[in-house]
Swiss-Prot record:
GO terms for cellular component: cytosol; extracellular region; peptidoglycan-based cell wall; plasma membrane. There is a cross-link at Y229-M255 (Tryptophyl-tyrosyl-methioninium (Tyr-Met) (with W-107)). The active site is at H108 (proton acceptor), W321 (tryptophan radical intermediate). PROSITE patterns: PEROXIDASE_1, PEROXIDASE_2, PEROXIDASE_4. This is Catalase-peroxidase. Its cofactor is heme b. Induction: By treatment with H(2)O(2). Repressed by FurA.
Length: 740
């Protein structure tokens, strides 16, 4: 689902009787008002210009990787440990240790990740900003971040908030006796919130995201607006552990977790700390974004008792899971299976479970030295016992706690790194040597790279192979454009365009030219590598990109431009065994406006899906525009469809797409085929061009038309070629973290 696009309504006007779409009054731009209020269905091109350089106070020359490398990680760990074990009167620590709070903070930062579009996760430090900083599920995490300010203040630019939030959770586990799998620094702070689609609901805890029996809308993972994953009281507050298990399995699957990882994360996370529901929830004040100015960014101020410590209210549930809440052990499972449970309510009125018939009364310590408590559990905790699959997993851990420790360590490591992309992006001394399958491994370069002479020779072989400009450009685009800037997955490196599942994706036209291109490039690779001197070799992945570059040079020459398209060798080839088919399946594009492809079941019209794709490719509006225009004239459309190919000189890198789109002698109308396409007719009424919604939006939308006019001018051809090549090179190298 695209980012920050309002629902598409049947009309462009609102409910006002005079036809004006704005009900009430217009807001100042500084209040958030603007054109979107008047025309809610207009394309929001701002999603292509998020976190601009001018908003970054560190400046363009700032090198976070270099700064974080100077940190003494042992000293940093000690500083965090001191914060964790020093209770502050303004927010007293349960059991004298903030570790459980920091685990929750890290979990909730990373746990927003969802597989279907790769958005969410801990990168960027998004938990600091709206809406995440004010989600009901993140209540009181504002205090956790304030507790860490002395550490952030000390290390300043050397340590990002994004890294600190997650590393504090890792340190908390270690502080309480758990051995973690490792940690990678490298999360760079952003300075404004990502405009992410979190759901259609306009109220907290709304659940309009479901249809049918319990079908959750893609790409969402959480069950309700404002929750990280599932409702701890059960589906919509129905405290049915078996029904909750259904939500748990689906939500965690959409967070990239299997059943074992899911169970391990729940058991491991709930080995520590407690929930907070000391009194009536209606005594809790507004979230940070709605709180009074004088609260200085803190929210959820409670008027129940002291509002803190023993009187704290967060989720409204009052559960302490174990009798050792600041120590790693197997007590969660021992208690879960050691008692029978009955449904009760917390002092705040929330559903929870208590050990039946008063069993275990007094065995659970109070966080502030009060009388001992009875064992308690969440409805979702009991799901691990009543669901047959989770029950089989967790009962084994009850007898084999060392297996639980191993699985939790790996699952936690995956949780907090899933949005970081390949391990090449992990920094610091705590990065494990082992690379895991979910990290989409690619082999290290084990040969000498091709130089200028070899590159020139390979280009000649590719051009003489019989492959067309269209075939070569389409294949290179298919490989590289699988990249997602959200979770840094995909891209041309690894050469996975020839592996399952990518080779079979509908958007890649697997029964068309793709397999022919693959075979031909493999033959060129084999021939070159067998004859090249010394240890010089070329990978298939490099050849795919080089083929596209060679084709663009040929097309530019046909248009009268002698250019050299940049090419940086160094990609390697992954094997099918290094490729998790199920994990890669979610990268399959359901729409790619750059190729004029629109699959079935998309939630929005094609032009909105184009913006979403461009956003995932980290493209600006000018880059998106020049790429669409160039790819059209190069014949890179899905199945070579003529839609948007506004030129008589296909496979020639001209600005014809823009020139002909702006031609006032062409009249556009919907196709009589009623297939969502359009016909452009000349003055005689003859159909001259056909186009898609993606094509026509560049003439219809005022901002995009302004860009088209740049590239459609009489003097624009050189600039068009230059800008197209630059944008092409950017996409080809989006996954080259080894060189950038």
């Amino acid at each position: 689902m695209p980012e920050q696009h309002p629902p598409i309504t049947e009309t462009t006007t609102g409910a006002a009787s005079n036809g004006c779409p704005v009900v009430g009054h217009m807001k100042y731009p500084v209040e958030g008002g603007g054109n979107q209020d008047w025309w809610p269905n207009r394309l929001n091109l701002k999603v292509l210009h998020q976190n601009p350089a001018v908003a970054d106070p560190m400046g363009a020359a700032f090198d976070y990787a270099a700064e974080v490398a100077t940190i003494d990680v042992d000293a940093l760990t000690r500083d965090i440990e001191e914060v964790m074990t020093t209770s502050q009167p303004w927010w007293p620590a349960d059991y004298g240790h903030y570790g459980p709070l920091f685990i929750r903070m890290a979990w909730h930062a990373a746990g927003t990740y969802r597989i279907h579009d790769g958005r969410g996760g801990a990168g960027g430090g998004m938990q600091r900003f709206a809406p995440l900083n004010s989600w009901p599920d993140n209540a009181s995490l504002d205090k956790a971040r304030r507790l860490l300010w002395p550490v952030k203040k000390k290390y300043g630019k050397k340590l990002s908030w994004a890294d600190l939030i997650v590393f504090a959770g890792n340190c908390a586990l270690e502080s309480m006796g758990f051995k973690t799998f490792g940690f990678g620094f490298g999360r760079v702070d952003q300075w404004e919130p990502d405009e992410v689609y979190w759901g259609k609901e306009a109220t907290w805890l709304g659940d309009e995201r479901y249809s049918g029996k319990r079908d959750l809308e893609n790409p969402l993972a959480a069950v309700q607006m404002g929750l990280i994953y599932v409702n701890p009281e059960g589906p919509n507050g129905n405290p049915d552990p078996m029904a909750a298990a259904v939500d748990i399995r689906e939500t965690f699957r959409r967070m990239a977790m299997n059943d074992v990882e899911t169970a391990a994360l729940i058991v491991g996370g709930h080995t520590f700390g407690k929930t907070h529901g000391a009194g009536p929830a209606d005594l809790v004040g507004p979230e940070p974004e709605a709180a009074p100015l004088e609260q200085m960014g803190l929210g959820w101020k409670s008027s129940y008792g002291t509002g803190t410590g023993k009187d704290a209210i967060t989720s409204g549930i009052e559960v302490v899971w174990t009798n050792t809440p600041t120590k790693w052990d197997n007590s969660f499972l021992e208690i879960l299976y050691g008692y029978e449970w009955e449904l009760t309510k917390s002092p705040a009125g929330a559903w929870q479970y208590t050990a039946k018939d008063g069993a275990g009364a007094g065995t659970i310590p109070d966080p502030f030295g009060g009388p001992g408590r009875s064992p308690t559990m969440l409805a979702t905790d009991l799901s691990l016992r009543v669901d047959p699959i989770y029950e089989r997993i967790t009962r084994r851990w009850l007898e084999h706690p060392e297996e639980l420790a191993d699985e939790f360590a790996k699952a936690w490591y995956k949780l907090i790194h899933r949005d970081m992309g390949p391990v090449a992006r992990y920094l610091g001394p705590l990065v494990p040597k082992q690379t895991l399958l979910w990290q989409d491994p690619v082999p290290a370069v084990s040969h000498d790279l091709v130089g200028e002479a070899e590159i020139a020779s390979l280009k000649s072989q590719i051009r003489a192979s019989g492959l067309t400009v269209s075939q070569l450009v389409s294949t290179a685009w298919a490989a590289a454009s699988s990249f997602r800037g959200s979770d840094k997955r995909g891209g041309a490196n690894g050469g996975r365009i020839r592996l399952q599942p990518q080779v079979g994706w509908e958007v890649n036209d697997p029964d068309g030219d793709l397999r022919k291109v693959i075979r031909t490039l493999e033959e060129i690779q084999e021939s070159f590598n067998s004859a090249a001197p010394g240890n010089i070799k070329v990978s298939f992945a490099d050849l795919v990109v080089l083929g596209g570059c060679a084709a663009i040079e040929k097309a530019a020459k046909a248009a009268g431009h002698n250019i050299t398209v940049p090419f940086t060798p160094g990609r390697t080839d992954a094997s099918q065994e290094q490729t998790d088919v199920e994990s890669f399946a979610v990268l399959e594009p359901k729409a790619d406006g750059f190729r004029n492809y629109l699959g079935k079941g998309n939630p929005l019209p094609a032009e909105y899906m184009l913006l979403d794709k461009a956003n995932l490719l980290t493209l600006s509006a000018p880059e998106m525009t020049v790429l669409v225009g160039g790819l059209r004239v190069l014949g890179a459309n899905y199945k070579r469809l003529p839609l948007g190919v506004f030129t008589e000189a296909s496979e020639s890198l001209t600005n014809d797409f823009f020139v002909n789109l702006l031609d006032m002698g062409i009249t556009w109308e919907p196709s009589p085929a009623d297939d969502g396409t359009y016909q452009g007719k000349d003055g005689s009424g003859k159909v001259k061009w056909t186009g898609s919604r993606v094509d026509l939006v560049f003439g219809s939308n005022s901002e995009l038309r302004a860009l088209v006019e740049v590239y459609g001018a009489d003097d624009a051809q050189p600039k068009f070629v230059q800008d197209f090549v630059a944008a092409w090179d950017k996409v080809m190298n989006l996954d080259r973290f080894d060189v950038r």
